[in-house]
């Protein structure tokens, strides 16, 4: 019998571990079995410094791990309506926007920014300090290296990833028109410049 507790208008499994002193959370979230939110950052020298901020209506499936930030940004941020499958790892200082899907066993290094509507396939690995563009799709078992550029609106696949084609189905599903995609591409370029300084 799976037992969930209602805490702060969220459903939290009784086996989940949440560092409530360092975690701010909205409403309508589902936090599954053995999820850990607020563990120390996976960094050999930097200590935790700051908080985790979680929005509304996110689903964290079993064994997800979300780590505290360092003094780099002092925030690990998760927006709204995201879906994280089992055993995903979100390391320190990450920023995940809205409507993002992380499939099972996805691993995000530190200080990664995932833009709206991106989908990462099973066992995708992302190098630290990367940006994943809006409405992009990363195929199963993909590897995003330091040199990868994941533009909005495209499908990428491989180890390391290569651009395959435009994500037409994903764009249609999310009702993204050309004007909206142009705006997201401009935002991606701005974030990319800031991240790569």
Predicted regions mapped to residue ranges:
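Conserved CoA-thioester-binding segment of acyl-CoA-metabolizing enzymes
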Residues: 13-17, 32
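Glycine-rich hexapeptide-repeat left-handed beta-helix
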Residues: 1-8, 30-54, 62-65, 69, ...
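Short metal-binding segments enriched for Cys and/or His
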Residues: 91
